[in-house]
């Protein structure tokens, strides 16, 4: 299912023409199967288009457009996981790589507010400048810090689910 020109134009109006594409070569790069699954296919279904929003306002506008036009959407940051793949046709990809800012580091209460594409290495470097540390999961320092924190409480050394002495 190819996007209608007016729908594609609406996505361009939100993120700019340089931050949306339906080029088959680029869509195929997003369709490489990223996880271990029982199927032998090397590719998942293609997204209808890929968008690269820069902030929450653009994310909200993309979601509104998807809802208006009966499209599904799938957002991902660094993309390490099969949950980033489309389940079928009619899906718009929100690649959040432009959302890579550390908004706040609260040293007193030991938390950070980050955008989705902030990777552990970036966060750790800023924390170390302040004498702080974070738990970098087994996924590695090139993975986004946000999804794992939201999904699994940031690992075994997190403040709220700790087995470690550092939180006393």
PLM regions and their residue ranges:
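Extended, alpha-helix-rich binding/interface surfaces that flank or overlap catalytic cores
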Residues: 117
């Amino acid at each position: 299912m190819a996007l209608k020109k007016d729908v594609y134009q609406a996505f361009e109006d939100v993120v700019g023409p340089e931050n949306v594409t339906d080029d088959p070569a680029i869509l195929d790069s997003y369709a490489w199967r990223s996880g271990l699954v029982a199927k032998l296919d090397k590719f998942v279904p293609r997204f209808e288009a890929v968008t690269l929003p820069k902030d929450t306002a653009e994310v909200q506008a993309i979601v509104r457009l998807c809802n208006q036009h009966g499209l599904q959407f799938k957002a991902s940051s660094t993309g390490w996981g099969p949950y980033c793949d489309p389940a079928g046709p009619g899906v718009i990809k929100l690649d959040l790589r432009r959302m890579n800012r550390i908004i706040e580091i609260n040293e007193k209460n030991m938390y950070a507010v980050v955008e989705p594409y902030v990777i552990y290495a970036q966060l750790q470097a800023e924390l170390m400048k302040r004498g702080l540390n974070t738990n970098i999961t087994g996924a590695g320092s090139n993975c986004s810090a946000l999804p794992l924190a939201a999904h699994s409480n940031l690992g075994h050394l997190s403040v709220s689910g700790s087995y470690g002495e550092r939180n006393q």
